[in-house]
Regions:
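P-loop NTPase catalytic core
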Residues: 1-153, 157, 161, 165, ...
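C-terminal accessory/interaction regions of large nucleic acid-associated machines
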Residues: 171-180
Length: 180
């Protein structure tokens, strides 16, 4: 707790994430960076990466937080005991976790992600998260997001803008168009 007052950036390692093989095992909720709060940093990132980069990062963080809250309610009340929106929120946070936060250090491509690729992938993930979807059951919701996670993970393992990457991108676009 005292670290939070002094440190501008803090990575909270999580045994739970490590046990679940979610690497790097940095807890996205307990970790923080105060640098995004500095106007000069926000201006720099918004100028160099995307005019709304900081806003998008904060939006992704919010999806993660709301997903954790939904997950806790699902665990307490059961799959059928919560509204479908809770499942949707949870799976959106899982999408961000698997595609943006997790990394395969043993994969030559996924171990290091250039900023232009990070920008593209965050935009695609937020595009999926922001798209209106309607599910009949929590199984349909789960299957929908698992399919998208699988496709986007393959994108993470493919050279950026390569033929394989474009093939997976087209699959993603087909799935998201079909489901909307």
């Amino acid at each position: 707790e005292s670290t939070k007052k002094a440190a501008r950036c803090f990575y909270a390692l999580s045994q739970n994430r490590a046990d679940r093989k979610r690497y790097p095992a940095v807890d996205p909720i307990d970790s923080y960076s105060k640098y995004l709060e500095y106007p000069e940093i926000a201006e720099y990132l918004n100028a160099k990466v995307d005019p709304q980069w900081v806003e998008k990062v904060n939006k992704a963080k919010n999806y993660i937080l709301r997903g954790k809250e939904a997950y806790e309610q699902i665990n307490i009340l059961g799959d059928d005991g919560v509204p479908m929106e809770y499942h949707n929120r949870y799976w959106k946070s899982e999408l961000i976790d698997f595609i943006i936060l997790q990394q395969d250090a043993f994969d030559a491509i996924d171990s290091s992600t250039p900023m232009d690729r990070q920008e593209f992938m965050l935009n695609k993930v937020l595009e999926v998260c922001d798209a209106p979807v309607d599910f009949e059951s929590f199984e349909d919701c789960s299957a929908h997001y698992k399919n998208i996670i699988n496709i986007m993970r393959q994108m993470n393992y493919s050279e950026y803008k390569s033929a394989d990457f474009e093939k997976y991108l087209e699959q993603l676009n087909t799935v998201t168009r079909h489901d909307n």
